[in-house]
Amino acid sequence: MSDSNLDEVLVLIPARMASTRLPGKPLADICGLPMIVQVAMRAKEAAIGRVVVAVDDQQVFDAVSAAGFDVVMTSSDHQSGSDRIFEALTKVDPDGKAKFIVNVQGDLPTIDPQTVRAALRPLENEAVDIGTLTTEIDDEDDKTAPHIVKIVGSPVSDTRLHALYFTRATAPHGKGPLYHHIGLYAYRRAALERFVSLGPSTLERRESLEQLRALEAGMRIDVEIVDTVPLGVDTPADLEKARRILSARTG
């Protein structure tokens, strides 16, 4: 998207305090700042539009606000990040000025701003409802690991796939690259509105993959190919790794 589209793009970052593996995750200190603030900084550095953090806890709200970022309180009852960002969207942009919504997960403090920008590129095609990201799988263990979500897609260019399916299985069969899905999404506003109105689908429940709801409803998802998977912070070990990465960048 060009600079003229900045007013049309809203970057929303959902943050939940209830993490079983890393309690209080949004407020975990990384180089002197809460993790959620580090994520907001990366999103701001992407320079694609307004950045708003969607929270469910007053401590997180206060920390984000103190850092100078826009923040909105949302319900703690949401079952998914998509539901949380939709509530945030209706609160911060009730007039519908934002045409494109980018959902950046709140546990990606080291993400490259260029990776955030890449999620928007598929929406340059008017036929695409949702843009997301992938990278080719190099590690042999990752090719069969159920926690690594794979994309079955048809190439539309050297750097983009048209998603046909997402699965935890090893797919597609046969020779050729396998692709690791990166859960960062860019939606057309109408697509997000439709998505949250649909409710969980059959394949979504079976694979525990929310994006299958869109495919089952006939929505088009295109996938930009990027170089690396951003570090998601889910455990204390991930947190230490994130601290080392950002310390090296700032040191």
Curated annotation (Swiss-Prot):
The keyword 4Fe-4S does not apply. Keywords: Cytoplasm, Lipopolysaccharide biosynthesis, Nucleotidyltransferase, Transferase. InterPro entries: Cytidylyl_trans, KdsB, Nucleotide-diphossugar_trans. It catalyses: 3-deoxy-alpha-D-manno-oct-2-ulosonate + CTP = CMP-3-deoxy-beta-D-manno-octulosonate + diphosphate. GO terms for molecular function: 3-deoxy-manno-octulosonate cytidylyltransferase activity. Its main location: cytoplasm. It comes from the Bacteria. Pfam families: CTP_transf_3. Activates KDO (a required 8-carbon sugar) for incorporation into bacterial lipopolysaccharide in Gram-negative bacteria. This is 3-deoxy-manno-octulosonate cytidylyltransferase.
